Amino acid sequence: MKKYLNLNVFTAAIQRLESLYNAGHKVVVSFSGGKDSTVCLELCIIAATRAKKLPVDVVMRDEEIMFPGTFEYCERVAKRPEVRFHWLVAHQPIINIFNRESPYFWVMDPALPKEQWVRQPPSYAESIPEKHIGALITKERFPTEEGKITYAVTGLRVEESPN
Protein backbone atom coordinates (compact mmCIF):
# COMPACT_ATOMS: atom_id res chain seq x y z
CA MET A 1 0.00 0.00 0.00
CA LYS A 2 1.37 3.41 -0.94
CA LYS A 3 1.53 6.06 1.71
CA TYR A 4 1.96 9.55 0.32
CA LEU A 5 4.07 12.06 2.20
CA ASN A 6 3.49 15.75 2.38
CA LEU A 7 6.91 16.32 0.75
CA ASN A 8 8.18 16.92 -2.74
CA VAL A 9 10.43 14.27 -4.30
CA PHE A 10 13.61 16.32 -3.87
CA THR A 11 13.08 16.89 -0.13
CA ALA A 12 12.07 13.26 0.45
CA ALA A 13 15.17 11.99 -1.38
CA ILE A 14 17.51 14.23 0.61
CA GLN A 15 15.87 13.22 3.90
CA ARG A 16 16.12 9.50 3.11
CA LEU A 17 19.76 9.75 2.10
CA GLU A 18 20.62 11.93 5.08
CA SER A 19 19.03 9.37 7.41
CA LEU A 20 21.28 6.65 5.94
CA TYR A 21 24.38 8.78 6.48
CA ASN A 22 23.30 9.74 10.01
CA ALA A 23 22.70 6.07 10.89
CA GLY A 24 26.30 5.28 9.90
CA HIS A 25 25.50 3.18 6.84
CA LYS A 26 27.78 3.15 3.80
CA VAL A 27 26.28 4.92 0.78
CA VAL A 28 27.92 4.36 -2.62
CA VAL A 29 26.81 6.10 -5.80
CA SER A 30 26.97 4.01 -8.96
CA PHE A 31 28.14 6.55 -11.54
CA SER A 32 28.18 6.47 -15.34
CA GLY A 33 28.66 10.12 -16.17
CA GLY A 34 25.09 10.36 -17.42
CA LYS A 35 22.24 12.57 -16.26
CA ASP A 36 20.59 10.05 -13.94
CA SER A 37 23.72 9.13 -12.01
CA THR A 38 24.77 12.79 -11.84
CA VAL A 39 21.46 13.67 -10.16
CA CYS A 40 22.00 10.82 -7.68
CA LEU A 41 25.52 12.04 -6.97
CA GLU A 42 24.38 15.61 -6.35
CA LEU A 43 21.61 14.40 -4.02
CA CYS A 44 24.13 12.34 -2.05
CA ILE A 45 26.54 15.28 -1.83
CA ILE A 46 23.78 17.46 -0.37
CA ALA A 47 22.75 14.76 2.13
CA ALA A 48 26.33 13.89 3.11
CA THR A 49 27.15 17.58 3.57
CA ARG A 50 24.19 18.01 5.91
CA ALA A 51 25.16 14.85 7.81
CA LYS A 52 28.84 15.90 7.86
CA LYS A 53 29.81 12.63 6.15
CA LEU A 54 31.80 13.85 3.15
CA PRO A 55 33.36 12.66 0.92
CA VAL A 56 30.75 10.66 -0.97
CA ASP A 57 31.87 7.25 -2.23
CA VAL A 58 31.40 6.96 -5.99
CA VAL A 59 32.10 3.91 -8.14
CA MET A 60 32.30 3.85 -11.91
CA ARG A 61 32.92 0.91 -14.23
CA ASP A 62 35.02 2.02 -17.18
CA GLU A 63 33.50 0.62 -20.37
CA GLU A 64 36.36 1.92 -22.58
CA ILE A 65 34.04 3.21 -25.31
CA MET A 66 32.82 6.54 -23.99
CA PHE A 67 32.16 9.80 -25.73
CA PRO A 68 35.18 12.05 -25.10
CA GLY A 69 32.97 14.61 -23.33
CA THR A 70 31.64 11.94 -20.96
CA PHE A 71 35.16 10.72 -20.18
CA GLU A 72 36.32 14.30 -19.49
CA TYR A 73 33.26 14.94 -17.31
CA CYS A 74 33.94 11.79 -15.26
CA GLU A 75 37.53 12.92 -14.76
CA ARG A 76 36.31 16.31 -13.49
CA VAL A 77 33.89 14.62 -11.08
CA ALA A 78 36.68 12.35 -9.83
CA LYS A 79 38.70 15.44 -8.83
CA ARG A 80 35.92 17.04 -6.78
CA PRO A 81 36.93 17.33 -3.11
CA GLU A 82 33.52 16.12 -1.88
CA VAL A 83 33.90 12.86 -3.84
CA ARG A 84 35.95 9.70 -3.17
CA PHE A 85 36.01 8.29 -6.70
CA HIS A 86 36.63 4.61 -7.45
CA TRP A 87 37.30 4.27 -11.19
CA LEU A 88 37.18 0.52 -11.83
CA VAL A 89 38.32 -1.40 -14.87
CA ALA A 90 36.78 -4.86 -15.07
CA HIS A 91 38.31 -6.54 -18.10
CA GLN A 92 35.04 -8.12 -19.19
CA PRO A 93 32.83 -8.55 -22.22
CA ILE A 94 29.91 -6.17 -22.67
CA ILE A 95 27.23 -6.02 -25.34
CA ASN A 96 28.62 -4.43 -28.49
CA ILE A 97 26.01 -2.01 -29.83
CA PHE A 98 28.42 -0.75 -32.49
CA ASN A 99 28.92 -3.91 -34.55
CA ARG A 100 26.21 -6.46 -35.43
CA GLU A 101 28.74 -9.08 -36.51
CA SER A 102 30.43 -9.18 -33.12
CA PRO A 103 27.85 -9.24 -30.30
CA TYR A 104 30.37 -8.59 -27.50
CA PHE A 105 33.18 -6.13 -26.93
CA TRP A 106 35.90 -7.05 -24.45
CA VAL A 107 36.59 -4.00 -22.27
CA MET A 108 40.28 -3.10 -22.26
CA ASP A 109 41.07 -6.59 -23.45
CA PRO A 110 44.10 -7.85 -21.51
CA ALA A 111 45.00 -10.07 -24.49
CA LEU A 112 45.66 -6.96 -26.61
CA PRO A 113 48.49 -4.46 -26.30
CA LYS A 114 47.23 -1.37 -24.46
CA GLU A 115 47.95 0.72 -27.55
CA GLN A 116 45.11 -1.12 -29.33
CA TRP A 117 42.51 -0.13 -26.75
CA VAL A 118 40.08 2.61 -27.78
CA ARG A 119 41.54 4.77 -24.99
CA GLN A 120 43.54 4.36 -21.81
CA PRO A 121 41.93 4.52 -18.37
CA PRO A 122 43.20 7.29 -16.09
CA SER A 123 46.31 6.54 -14.05
CA TYR A 124 44.29 6.24 -10.83
CA ALA A 125 41.89 3.61 -12.23
CA GLU A 126 41.90 0.27 -10.45
CA SER A 127 41.82 -2.96 -12.45
CA ILE A 128 39.70 -5.55 -10.70
CA PRO A 129 39.75 -9.32 -11.25
CA GLU A 130 35.97 -9.71 -11.17
CA LYS A 131 34.26 -10.02 -14.55
CA HIS A 132 30.72 -9.02 -13.60
CA ILE A 133 28.94 -5.82 -12.64
CA GLY A 134 27.76 -7.24 -9.32
CA ALA A 135 31.32 -7.05 -8.04
CA LEU A 136 31.51 -3.26 -8.20
CA ILE A 137 29.87 -2.52 -4.85
CA THR A 138 30.82 -5.22 -2.38
CA LYS A 139 31.38 -5.37 1.37
CA GLU A 140 35.03 -6.12 0.67
CA ARG A 141 35.49 -3.01 -1.48
CA PHE A 142 33.32 -0.80 0.75
CA PRO A 143 33.54 -2.19 4.29
CA THR A 144 31.06 -1.04 6.91
CA GLU A 145 31.00 -0.97 10.65
CA GLU A 146 29.44 -3.94 12.45
CA GLY A 147 25.67 -3.99 11.97
CA LYS A 148 25.71 -1.39 9.19
CA ILE A 149 24.64 -1.85 5.56
CA THR A 150 26.16 -0.77 2.25
CA TYR A 151 23.57 0.97 0.09
CA ALA A 152 24.07 1.42 -3.66
CA VAL A 153 22.45 4.53 -5.12
CA THR A 154 21.65 3.99 -8.78
CA GLY A 155 19.95 6.41 -11.13
CA LEU A 156 17.12 4.73 -13.00
CA ARG A 157 14.26 6.48 -14.73
CA VAL A 158 10.75 5.38 -13.84
CA GLU A 159 10.08 4.38 -17.47
CA GLU A 160 13.06 2.01 -17.33
CA SER A 161 12.16 0.49 -13.97
CA PRO A 162 10.63 -3.01 -13.94
CA ASN A 163 8.31 -2.06 -11.04
Task: Label the predicted regions.
Residues 1-163:
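ATP-dependent adenylation/nucleotidyltransferase module used to activate substrates
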